[in-house]
Amino acid sequence: MKISFISDLHTKHWQWEVANKEQLDNFHNSDVIVFSGDMSSRGYEHEVKNFLEWFNNLNKSAVKIFIAGNHDFFFDTEWYGRTRLGVDRHESHNEIIQKDIEKLLCVYPDLIYLNDSGFEYKGVKFWGSPITPWFHDWAFNRLDDEIGSHWEVIPDDIDILITHGPPFGIGDLLHPKFQRLNEDKNVGCPHLLKEIDRVKPIIHAFGHIHEGWGTYKQDNTLFINASCLNQDYKPINPPITIELDLLTKTTKII
């Protein structure tokens, strides 16, 4: 099974496709395409629609899976309802936003949206979550004292874990210009790293930290930071494509 991974396009999907046109053969011929969040810049519905239209029209034979990221406010019912509607959290407002999300997703029935949920294809089990550690109240942020219990719900038997943010120490090193004195240069989630040690997925795909783009192997897990934009938001990072052997559950980067 050929799987391509992308992330963090921030409305620049068209520019990215043009900039990487000579490196997209495997991408356009993949069996599965996985997007790890941050399709938008400011989380507006029109930004999300524009991306989903592009994503939906990629390789029609491919299964396309996506999650939201911390920029994708539209998908966060609590955040969007609380801030855009100018009200405190209230169930009725959350339901209104949820209906808007469902209405939009119905336009693209072939796209698989994961929000702390799973999907199985040809025996390969995917599980996706948009949650990231707290950072100035962006979408899907969780405080340190609650994010640990969140990751504990990741099933034990998944093959491919998709999150927006990285685990601590893997693909999470900030570019020097973003590093601050007396603050950790690695900004991934230690609680997520702990649960990865429990779950032991074949692949963990993420983005969020653009400068961490690339692949990392630790024990038997292949970690993929698939950020398509670099730290300067230039769309220069190509997709990362792997071949997954369905019998041995081993991977090869192609």
Model-predicted regions and their roles:
Residues 120-122, 191-199, 203, 210-254:
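Binuclear metal-dependent phosphoesterase catalytic core
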Residues 5-7, 33-38, 63-70, 114-115, ...:
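Active-site neighborhood of phospho(di)ester-bond hydrolases with catalytic His/Asp-centered motifs
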Residues 9-11, 42, 57, 66-187, ...:
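Conserved catalytic scaffold of divalent metal-dependent phosphoesterases
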Residues 18-21, 48-51, 79-83, 141, ...:
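Short, glycine/charged-enriched secondary-structure capping and boundary segments
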Residues 1-66, 72-78, 153-157, 162:
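N-terminal active-site segment of His-dependent metallophosphoesterases
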Residues 27-28, 35, 51, 60, ...:
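Aromatic-residue hotspot detector
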Residues 1-4, 111, 118-128, 156, ...:
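Beta-strand-turn-beta hairpins that frame and shape the catalytic cleft
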